């Protein structure tokens, strides 16, 4: 089964042209108050962690909340950040280290919701490796240095006091999987549904998402980000996007046939067993109240500084609160929205 993530993937120039058109109609819709506010919404990855937005879009939950969301799969968080800073979009679906790097470089893109506030990766290895100590002297593939796959692996190795592992930057999840299949690496850090595909190929899940959670390390694998300047002046739009996302999460967990249909459509999964496992994943791994864990943002920042991927001096003078804003989720909580949604 081919899990290469090419669906909905646009060349950057085409994407920028598309989002400029979306941005140009925001102001009139806000003034008239008659039509849904049209906004570009870049997101990634094309995987199970993005399903709430797909379900919300396909089920008209964004429109119900007064926003006409133009969903554009980009996939690479750094590209999304760069485009947002250029004004091509003001709100997006992503999470993780890219937000930290952006703020420390003077950008104003912050995390405003955490739909998946923990690691959801698995460490897949050759079947001959049966314990964590078997990684010594081996090569493990990740997507990019400083990405979620990298930080998950480093946290795992550090907690198990394993140092002699070669970490190889593969480029993307498809490349990491290919490296494992071809034998160029002994292990790869991947996310569902790729985990399920590798299991069917005979590889071993040495470390599961549950094992990573037991490490007690918070992480924002996915969520919603926004430019602080936009969020401050367009608070109602941000609240509506978060509401639609939460409603998509609820519908996704409650309507198994619909969810499986959309997983099959967008992720090209047709195998009944993989569809079932994918549904179990999305029904169990999303936050009902998508608060951003402050400790997770702090841990990510510290890890990036230790890896020299961000300016450590800048981090020392930057308060942790500069990376996120939980006031939007808190406002929805205080209004009783989440309690009513999940009762």
Language-model-derived ranges and their functions:
Residues 302-343:
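Conserved C-terminal helix/tail region of periplasmic/extracytoplasmic solute-binding proteins
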Residues 29-33:
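Sec/Tat signal peptide C-region and signal peptidase I cleavage site
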Residues 147-165, 240-273, 318, 327-336:
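Ligand-binding clefts/hinges and TM-proximal coupling segments of bilobed small-molecule sensing domains
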Residues 232-313:
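Secondary-structure end/capping motifs
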Residues 1-13, 17, 23-27:
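Short, basic, low-complexity termini and linkers enriched in Ser/Thr/Gly/Pro
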Residues 50, 81, 96, 150, ...:
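Extracytoplasmic/secreted envelope proteins and their assembly/folding machinery
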């Amino acid at each position: 089964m081919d899990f290469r993530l090419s669906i909905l993937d646009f060349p950057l120039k085409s994407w920028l042209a598309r989002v400029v058109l979306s941005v140009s109609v925001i102001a009139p819709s806000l003034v008239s108050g008659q039509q849904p506010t049209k906004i570009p919404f870049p997101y990634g990855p094309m995987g199970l962690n993005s399903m709430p937005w797909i379900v919300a879009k396909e089920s008209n939950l964004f429109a119900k909340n007064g926003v006409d969301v133009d969903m554009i799969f980009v996939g690479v968080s750094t590209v999304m950040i760069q485009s947002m800073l250029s004004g091509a979009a003001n709100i997006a679906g992503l999470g993780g280290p890219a937000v930290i790097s952006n703020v420390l470089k003077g950008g104003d893109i912050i995390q405003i919701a955490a739909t998946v506030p923990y690691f959801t990766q698995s460490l897949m290895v050759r079947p001959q490796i049966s314990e964590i100590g078997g990684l010594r002297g081996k090569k493990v593939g990740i997507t990019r240095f400083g990405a979620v796959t990298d930080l998950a692996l480093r946290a795992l190795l550090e907690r198990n006091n394993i140092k002699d592992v070669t970490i190889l930057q593969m480029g993307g999840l498809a490349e990491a999987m290919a490296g494992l299949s071809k034998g160029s690496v002994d292990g790869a850090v991947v996310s569902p549904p790729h985990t399920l595909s590798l299991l069917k190929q005979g590889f071993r899940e040495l470390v599961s998402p549950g094992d990573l959670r037991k490490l007690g390390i918070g992480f924002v694998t996915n969520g919603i980000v926004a430019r602080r300047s936009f969020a401050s002046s367009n608070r109602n739009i941000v609240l509506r996007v978060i509401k639609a996302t939460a409603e998509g999460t609820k519908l996704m967990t409650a309507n198994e046939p619909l969810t499986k249909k959309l997983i099959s459509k967008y992720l090209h999964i047709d195998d009944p067993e993989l569809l079932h496992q994918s549904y179990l994943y999305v029904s169990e791994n999303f936050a009902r109240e998508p608060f951003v864990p402050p400790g997770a943002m702090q841990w990510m920042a510290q890890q990036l500084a230790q890896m020299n991927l961000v300016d450590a001096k800048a981090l020392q003078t930057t308060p942790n609160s500069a990376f996120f804003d939980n006031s939007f989720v808190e406002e929805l909580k205080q209004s009783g929205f989440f309690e009513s949604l999940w009762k």
